[in-house]
């Protein structure tokens, strides 16, 4: 049996910005005149524009993406519309209506963040969560649109809304959004910061699997790639693990993930090559030898498989009982 190293967990979702169940009632409504007035008043609260400018010290002062398609949302459909825009930019042309069954919860009249993430992964895309101005600006400057969750209402009257950030101009103190029914919506940075803050600065980058996020961190990125495995998107997972290894050459988890993804795809030869290389680079890791033994055995290379399985048991560790099962399975099949 093949084993993966779960030094990171599949995304369960830091998805509750308010800490209350009302967070999940994401709405995409037009504000009434009264609420607009309240929002404008609240938008005048002090926010440090300098913080945004400091985050962009090494970035262009302004940047706009012109390759993100725009889909005007229908009522309550900001989730499907935003995801369709991000997927379209990544090279997958999918209409919002086709995404609605995957992300929209009719009883809530909205889309949950985990559903947005899961849908992106089912379509073979790396869904990478970010948070805060620094990450947002870096991703935009790298040419990556970012889905954001805003509360266009107030903390006690939430109006949840997904939009796609496609640009910024820090000199003019604005961000540029595909939002609602408005293409390239110019929004005051002060107002955007307030509405985004109420969503705990949650953002989502949706990328082709061979492309790393500008703000990628090893464990967070590999957790996102595990999501592709969970979605059985093996070809995409292979591309994403290769991208990870181009950045983190000594990542044991990326090596194991790549080998396991080849195995799941039925490409035993490539799985063997990757796992053999992994045992040489990480000779103290029993999982690598155990998985190599399984792949060798399934190719009929029983003596080599026995050697690898015995070595895994010799190395021991918390999974030694599983390694022993692999060894016994191979021994039972070996004359």
Label each PLM-derived region with a short phrase.
Residues 5, 14-34:
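Bacterial N-terminal signal peptides that target proteins for export
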Residues 8, 16-19, 279, 335:
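N-terminal compositionally biased, intrinsically disordered segments and leader/signal-like regions
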Residues 43-109, 152, 171, 218-221, ...:
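Active-site-adjacent structural segments surrounding the nucleophilic cysteine of cysteine proteases
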Residues 45-69, 89, 94, 98-208, ...:
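Conserved active-site-adjacent core of cysteine acyl-enzyme catalytic domains
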């Amino acid at each position: 049996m093949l084993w993966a190293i779960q030094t990171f967990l599949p995304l369960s979702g830091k998805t509750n910005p308010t800490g209350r169940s009302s967070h999940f009632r994401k709405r995409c409504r037009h504000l009434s005149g009264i609420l607009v007035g309240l929002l404008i008043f609240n938008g005048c609260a002090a926010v440090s524009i300098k913080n945004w400018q400091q985050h962009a010290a090494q970035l262009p002062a302004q940047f706009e993406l012109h390759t993100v398609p725009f889909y005007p949302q229908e009522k309550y459909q900001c989730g499907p519309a935003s995801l369709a825009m991000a997927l379209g930019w990544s090279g997958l042309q999918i209409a919002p209506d086709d995404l609605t069954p995957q992300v929209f919860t009719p009883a809530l009249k909205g889309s949950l963040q985990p559903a947005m993430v899961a849908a992106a992964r089912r379509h073979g895309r790396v869904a990478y969560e970010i948070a805060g101005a620094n990450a947002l600006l870096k991703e935009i400057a790298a040419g990556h649109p970012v889905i954001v969750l805003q509360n266009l209402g107030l903390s006690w009257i939430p109006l949840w809304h997904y939009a796609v950030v496609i640009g910024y101009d820090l000199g003019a103190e604005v961000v540029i959004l595909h939002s609602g029914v408005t293409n390239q919506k110019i929004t005051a940075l002060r107002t955007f910061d307030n509405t985004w803050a109420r969503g705990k600065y949650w953002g989502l980058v949706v990328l082709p699997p061979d492309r790393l996020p500008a703000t990628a961190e090893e464990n967070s990125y590999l957790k996102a790639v595990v999501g592709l495995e969970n979605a059985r998107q093996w070809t995409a997972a292979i591309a994403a693990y290769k991208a990870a290894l181009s950045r983190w050459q000594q990542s044991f988890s990326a090596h194991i993930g790549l080998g396991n993804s080849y195995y799941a795809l039925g490409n035993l030869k490539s799985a063997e090559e990757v796992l053999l290389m992994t045992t040489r680079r990480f000779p103290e890791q029993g999982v690598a030898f155990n998985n190599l033994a399984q792949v060798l055995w399934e190719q009929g290379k029983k003596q080599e498989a026995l050697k690898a399985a015995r070595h895994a048991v010799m190395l021991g560790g918390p999974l030694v009982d599983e390694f022993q099962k692999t060894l016994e399975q191979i021994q039972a099949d070996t004359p």
